């Protein structure tokens, strides 16, 4: 009977220890994911402040001063005054 009480106590202590280890591991993962998300958002916020050298698709433009991104094959449409994709050239 003493062995059974001791084994039950050890089993219960093992379960408590397993719970504590899992809880600590989970909280570390949450902290890591929160830090990762914060760093990604910080990088995104920094890039918003910088101006691009050229305009992206569907951005308003001036046909006489075409600043649409040439690397993306964009041109300023005289009709709509937006940067659009140039097909065929």
UniProtKB/Swiss-Prot annotation:
Annotated keywords: Amidation, Disulfide bond, Ion channel impairing toxin, Knottin, Neurotoxin, Presynaptic neurotoxin, Pyrrolidone carboxylic acid, Secreted, Signal, Toxin, Voltage-gated sodium channel impairing toxin
Q: Which SUPFAM superfamilies match?
A: omega toxin-like
Outcome after substituting residue 82 to A: Almost complete loss in ability to inhibit both Nav1.2/SCN2A and Nav1.7/SCN9A
Q: Where in the cell is it found?
A: Secreted
- Changes after translation: Two forms of huwentoxin-IV exist in the venom of H.schmidti, a non-N-terminally modified (HwTx-IV) and a naturally modified peptide with pyroglutamic acid residue at position 53 (mHwTx-IV). mHwTx-IV shows no observable difference with the unmodified toxin when applied to the TTX-S sodium channel of DRG neuron (IC(50)~50 nM) or when tested on hNav1.7/SCN9A (IC(50)=30.8 nM). In addition, similarly to the unmodified toxin, mHwTx-IV has only a weak affinity for lipid membranes.
Effect ascribed to mutating residue 56 to A: No change in activity on both Nav1.2/SCN2A and hNav1.5/SCN5A, and controversial activity on Nav1.7/SCN9A
An example of a Gene Ontology cellular component annotation for this protein is: extracellular region
Major place of localization?
A: secreted
Q: Which Pfam families match?
A: Toxin_12
What effect is documented for mutating residue 85 to A? Important decrease in ability to inhibit both Nav1.2/SCN2A and Nav1.7/SCN9A
Query: Between which residues do disulfide bridges form?
Result: 54-69, 61-76, 68-83
Consequence of substituting residue 58 to W: In gHuwentoxin-IV; shows higher affinity for lipid membranes and a 4-fold increase in ability to inhibit hNav1.7/SCN9A compared to both huwentoxin-IV and mhuwentoxin-IV
Q: Which GO terms describe its molecular function?
A: ion channel inhibitor activity; sodium channel regulator activity; toxin activity
Q: Which residues carry this modification: Pyrrolidone carboxylic acid (Glu)?
A: 53
**rRNA-binding found in the keyword field:** no
Which residues, in ranges, are excised as the propeptide?
25-52
Free-text comment about domains: The presence of a 'disulfide through disulfide knot' structurally defines this protein as a knottin.
Q: Which family does it belong to?
A: Belongs to the neurotoxin 10 (Hwtx-1) family. 22 (Htx-4) subfamily.
Job of this protein: This lethal neurotoxin (without cyclization at position 53) inhibits neuronal voltage-gated sodium channel Nav1.2/SCN2A (IC(50)=10-150 nM), rNav1.3/SCN3A (IC(50)=338 nM), Nav1.6/SCN8A (IC(50)=117 nM), and hNav1.7/SCN9A (IC(50)=9.6-33 nM). It inhibits activation of sodium channel by trapping the voltage sensor of domain II (DIIS4) in the closed configuration. The toxin neither shifts the Nav1.7/SCN9A activation curve nor modifies the slope factor. It does not slow fast-inactivation of hNav1.7/SCN9A channels. In addition, it has only a weak affinity for lipid membranes.
Q: What is this protein called?
A: Huwentoxin-IV
Species for this entry: Cyriopagopus schmidti
**Classification of source organism:** Eukaryota, Metazoa, Ecdysozoa, Arthropoda, Chelicerata
